[in-house]
Amino acid sequence: RAISYRHTNNIHFSQVKMSVTIQKMVRSDIGSAGVAFSIDPETGYNKSIVINSAYGLGELVVSGGVKPDEIVVNKRTLDNKNCDPILSKKIGDKKTKIVYDKSGTIELETSKDEENTYSLSDDQYVYLANVIDKLEKAYQELFDSPIGIDTEWALDGLDNKIYIIQARPETIHSNNETLEV
């Protein structure tokens, strides 16, 4: 259907700004998941990375159905071993999470321990921020533009690895002129 649409509308394949990845099923239902922005999604500030995370599948974070943990990381200090790049951390209440069951998925209450514990370690937040920073640079090179990116990610509870589920250009602030501070 997509190929037919592009052909009918004379859209060359190089104009399509989407990629598709086939990967293993990530077991974030027994890990955590969330979103990350390479610019502040509220202000457009482009020197920080904002990560939202919660336990279970990422659906509740993406839809706003849960108050996630929020971590802000300074891009300028990501490579500086003498400086902590984490600017701020706010723990979310994370009252519920979505997990797999026999018939699909179900929403469960999180444990008190999960509510009061960040859903990633500081090292994992910094690792994820580094990945987001590299993805942003790749997108900027690809589009020859200073765009930010919006990503969805998941931590597999079995192998303890972070996977990027989706990455796309950020659409609210990236179209505006970027201000240097």
What are these regions, as identified by a protein language model?
Residues 1-181:
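Conserved mixed alpha/beta core segments that line enzyme active sites in large multi-domain catalysts
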